[in-house]
Amino acid sequence: MLFRRILPIPMTLLVLGLAAAAAEAAPVSRSGNLVGADGTTLGKVTVTEAPHGVLLRLSVEGLMPGWHGLHFHEKADCEAPGFKSAGSHVHAATPVVHGLMNPEANDDGDLPNLYVGADGTAMVELYSTLVSMQGAGGRPALLDADGSAVVIHANPDDYMSQPIGGAGDRVACAPIK
C-alpha cells in the first residue's frame, strides 16, 4: 500500500523534469507580421535560433514581381509608410561596410535577395551566420533591448555598393521582438 502512495511522487518528478528539459532545449524563435507601406499585412516572418546563426522563414504576397533586397534592421519598429524607424542594418562594427560580395563587408544585417513571382508572392527559408537571436558566438543579437526588423526593399541588392546595395525604398517590414 505504501508503495502505491510513494511511486507516483518520483514518476511525477520525472515527468516534470523531462518537460522542463524539453522546454529548455527548444530554440528561441520569434515571429512578426510583414506590413506594407499602407499598413496592411502582407505576410509573416519567423526567425529561429540555430547552432551557428538564425533560420529565417518568410512568406509574403502583394509585392511587385522580381528581385528585392532583404535585410535585418536594428530596431523592431515598423512605422509606415517608409519604415525608417527600423533604423540601419544590424551591425557590430562601425563604419558599416555593406555587401555580401564585398570582401571588406562587416554588415551583419545582409541577406540574399528575395525573388517575388509574377503573382506577387514569395516563400523562402534563409540561413544567416552573421547574427544570432541572443548574442551567441559574439554575433549581434536580434533580440537586444529594442529588437530588430526584417525589411524588404523595392529593388534588388547588388551586394557591393554603399550604403545598401542600391536596394531602394523599404516596402515591407516585420518587427522581431
Q: Language-model features: where?
A:
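N-terminal leader/targeting pre-sequences
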Residues: 21-177
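Bacterial N-terminal signal peptides that target proteins for export
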Residues: 1-11
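Hydrophobic h-region of N-terminal signal peptides that target proteins for export
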Residues: 13-23
